[in-house]
Regions:
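Short, surface-exposed, charged/polar-biased interaction segments
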Residues: 31, 35, 92, 109, ...
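Charge-rich (especially acidic), low-complexity segments
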Residues: 116-238
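Histidine-centered catalytic/metal-coordination loop motif
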Residues: 65-133
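Strand-helix-loop interaction patch of compact alpha/beta domains
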Residues: 1-86, 95-99
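Acidic, Ser/Thr-rich intrinsically disordered and amphipathic helical segments
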Residues: 9, 36, 103-110, 158
């Protein structure tokens, strides 16, 4: 059970975080456990994590802030294994380096997020520097996981409850994707129909032109033949 001082400190930090949010990060304590915080990190532009939304957890000890929290990622990201603690200087892997003056906001800024200003996700060099909890993956694999991240997150009931705005974003992206598919299908159908109609009309026009020229030649031949017969009749009459 959390100490009274721990609960008060975390409540105070949540209020401070609500007033001054960390850019591209959303964090909320669990409604049933103040020691468990859930966060979502947005991937930065120009990185393999662009477009991704990475869901993770902070697990605070009962005597926080005198001891650091544990940090884990839930969303598959290609940089860290899911549901396993991540090793970093501000986590419970290194309690000797922890400073009780550090806040949750600072912790989130230093969390191994998929953003350009941190080296933990291997963004700057696009590498896979090994550390406890890390995994290896290609840039392409990270990009694919980024595209799939929201769809993966909304499967979690806790995520849906804590971050309804991101669920709405996911639904909006699905709607836009559906409209794009329907629009592309309609354009393809229109293009397929247009050449067929034009070709049919062209062929019909060509056939009519051929028939007209053929009819004209027959008329000319008939006229020419009639004139020859009249000349022959005139010769016999003389």
């Amino acid at each position: 059970m959390a100490d009274k001082a721990c609960v008060q400190r975390l409540q105070k930090e949540f209020k401070a975080l609500s007033r001054e949010p960390v850019p591209h990060v959303v964090a909320k304590p669990s409604p049933s456990d103040i020691l468990e915080w859930h966060f979502v990190l947005e991937g930065s532009e120009g990185t393999p994590f662009q477009g991704g939304f990475y869901y993770g957890k902070l697990k605070f000890p009962p005597d926080y802030p005198f001891k650091p929290p544990g940090i884990s990622m839930i969303t598959p990201n290609g940089r860290f294994a899911t549901h396993k603690k991540i090793c970093m200087s501000m986590s419970d892997f290194h309690p000797e380096s922890w400073n009780p003056m550090w806040s949750v906001s600072r912790l989130l800024l230093q969390t191994p997020v998929p953003r350009a200003q941190t080296a933990y996700m291997g963004v700057k060099k696009m590498d896979n520097a090994p550390t406890t909890g890390s995994i290896n993956s290609t840039v392409e694999e990270k990009q694919l996981l980024a595209k799939q991240s929201l769809a993966c997150n909304v499967k979690s009931a806790t995520f849906r409850k804590l971050f309804p705005e991101l669920v709405d974003k996911h639904n909006e992206l699905l709607r836009l994707a559906k409209e794009e598919v329907e629009r592309a299908a309609a354009e393809a159908a229109a293009k397929a129909a247009a050449p067929g109609t034009s070709k049919s009309g062209s062929e019909g026009g060509s056939q009519n032109s051929v028939r007209s020229r053929s009819k004209g030649r027959k008329t000319e031949e008939s006229t020419a033949g009639g004139g020859g017969q009249q000349r022959n009749d005139a010769v016999h009459a003389r």
